[in-house]
Swiss-Prot record:
Pfam families: Pro_isomerase. Belongs to the cyclophilin-type PPIase family. PPIase D subfamily. Its EC number is 5.2.1.8. Residues 7-174 form the PPIase cyclophilin-type domain. This is Peptidyl-prolyl cis-trans isomerase D. GO terms for biological process: protein refolding.
Length: 371
């Protein structure tokens, strides 16, 4: 059978943000799917608990958002997770637990224990196997995944999981059986610098974390954009792109790479932080320089030349924040890896001069205090 489809039109803080399209597993959980479809359609009468409130998701909000877990909605009576109602009455039984919570973007019933399904449901943002056997999975998001991620990232009110800005279902309904998701529905918009990758690899339709070549391509592409911007002296843009590459690397944990691919990934763990360091120096973001260079010094793939660069750049950062002792320590250590480097030698001389000036300034200050 053709699985039925429904949609939510979403606004955040009153601004329209787009549409989420769901496909319902009516062939597996017909009663649960029918409940959702009827609540999207909004033609099943009024709520028994509040006779002036329609049985409809329209006008309701996503009242609970937990990053790296799920986003919850469906309380159209109380708007806080304490209400809602099914088309069958206040609650209905768990239909079955056949489908597992094994991926993001699944649609699953929220409940307060066994056989307490109503109208509240949630969309998974990651696999949630601990919910298997407790919550009924009855559909999935087939369009609007970027919007789901946007909702997931909403800032919440202090001490709660409620978004600070209302995430509202402005409209909802059913789609025809022959509806097809547009080919470019999940395509990431290209920014003005040519970057069309999401901020996170797991959110990007172009990247398959099980295929290392797609990860490498993502890192290389964004890194090249950063280098182009650096050459054009757009240092802050370059820094942002290099940091994006660094984020890609830190969220990628392969366990079965061949030697060649592992070398590429490990090399990135040296070149990307070094690029961050030089762009951050140009941007006067000295904290980022120190963090990036420290990562290089601990990287397995860092050779003597890379360590010299890291120590040199970190030394310059310390120099610029007037910590001449730390600057000299790094710069002198850099000479053990690159003994005849003119730039390092100059930086050492500049730092010695600066420290001497600081010492003389302190002496004058003390003489005025006690003179």
């Amino acid at each position: 059978m053709t699985r039925p489809k429904a949609y939510f039109d979403i606004s955040i803080g009153g601004t329209p943000k787009g549409r989420i399209v769901f496909e319902l597993y009516k062939d597996v959980v017909p009663k649960t799917a029918e409940n959702f479809l009827k609540l999207c359609e909004g033609k099943s009468g009024m709520a028994k608990s509040k006779p002036d409130v329609p049985l409809s998701y329209k006008g309701s909000i996503f009242h609970r958002v937990i990053k790296d877990f799920m986003i919850q909605f469906g309380d159209f009576t109380n708007f806080d997770g304490t209400g809602g109602e099914s088309i069958y009455g206040e609650k209905f039984e768990d239909e079955n637990f056949e489908i597992k919570h094994d991926k993001p973007f699944l649609l699953s019933m929220a409940n307060a224990g066994p056989n307490t399904n109503g109208s509240q449901a949630f969309i998974t943002c990651v696999p949630t196997p601990h919910l298997d056997g407790k919550h009924v999975v009855f559909g999935e998001v087939i369009e609007g995944k970027r919007l789901v991620r946007l909702i997931e990232k909403q800032q919440t009110e202090d001490g709660t999981d409620k978004p600070m800005h209302d995430v509202k279902v402005e409209g909802c309904g059913l789609l025809p059986d022959d509806y097809e998701v547009p080919a470019d529905a999940e395509q990431t918009p290209t920014d003005e610098f040519g970057d069309n990758y999401e901020e996170s690899l797991k959110d990007d339709a172009k990247v398959d974390l099980k295929k290392v070549e797609t990860v490498i391509k993502a890192i290389e592409t964004v890194k090249d954009i950063g280098t182009k911007q650096f050459k054009e002296q757009n240092y802050e843009v370059a820094l942002a792109k290099y940091k994006k590459c660094d984020k890609f690397l830190k969220e990628y944990f392969p366990d079965d790479l061949n030697e060649e691919d592992m070398k590429k990934i490990n090399d990135f763990k040296v070149t990307v932080p070094l690029n961050i360091a030089i762009a951050a120096l140009k941007s006067k973001d000295y904290r980022s320089v120190m963090v990036a260079c420290s990562e290089v010094l601990y990287a397995e793939a860092a050779d003597a030349k890379a360590k010299a660069k890291a120590l040199y750049r970190r030394g310059l950062a310390y120099y610029h924040v007037n910590d001449t002792d730390m600057a000299l320590a790094d710069l002198e250590m850099a000479t053990t890896f690159q003994p005849n480097d003119a730039a390092i030698a100059k930086a050492i001389n500049d730092t010695i001069k600066k420290r001497k000036q600081e010492t003389e300034k302190q002496k004058k200050s003390l003489s005025k205090m006690f003179g």
